[in-house]
Amino acid sequence: MAAFEPNAERFAEDLKGRFVRIPPINLTEKNGSIEFIKPSADGSDLKIGIVSARFNDWACDAMFASCYEELKAHGVKDENIVVTTVPGALEIPGALVMLYEGYPDLDALVAIGCVIRGETYHFELVANESSRGVTDFVTTEGISVANCILTVENEEQAKVRVQEKGADAARVALEMGNLRRFCGRRVMENYGEDNGQ
């Protein structure tokens, strides 16, 4: 059997006519019958929950600090931020559940942790299971979690990433929290608080 060798010209010829280039669309306004929801990072009316691991605390503290500063820069008030800490990344999914049960008015959550590869399989276990737990929580509860669980090979990689990762997570939480608010208002407009059922 011959080895596969990619042929760019043949590939391009095979695709010719199969795809239509879509012109850029302004995603901030109604375009014909398509309604686009404008992304928003305005945090002035949002309530955000944060779960931060204490293991590798130097990294988690740095991510928390940059997340907090970004939330504040976008208008989130201190009284609208709820924070708890847990021993490590594996405890984050359970804490997300408890935090959301205790504060059902949260608009979005942030999960902060740092998993650094060691010499055993434990790295894969913690990295995979904490991520799976966060994803399971999101799909079960219907609230967004900005996943800021950093998984890296070594401390040097973590040091390079911690500052921006926390700020990125804050922006994700803000945008998704606003989307949740917008969609919640649409549900109320369409069905009202009491639709008679």
Predicted regions and their residues:
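N-terminal glycine-rich FAD/FM-binding segment characteristic of electron-transfer flavoproteins
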Residues: 2-43, 58-62, 85-104, 179, ...
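C-terminal binding/interaction regions
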Residues: 3-7, 11, 15-24, 123-197
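Glycine-rich phosphate/diphosphate-binding loop of Rossmann-like nucleotide-binding domains
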Residues: 36-86
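Proline-centered loop/turn at the N-terminus of a beta-strand
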Residues: 47, 108, 142-146
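Short, ordered loop/turn segments at secondary-structure junctions
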Residues: 54-55, 86, 114-115, 149-153
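Electropositive phosphate-/nucleotide-binding environments in soluble metabolic enzymes
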Residues: 57, 61, 65, 86-90, ...
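Short, well-ordered amphipathic alpha-helices
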Residues: 68-71, 100, 174-177
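Glycine-rich phosphate-binding loop
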Residues: 91, 95-133
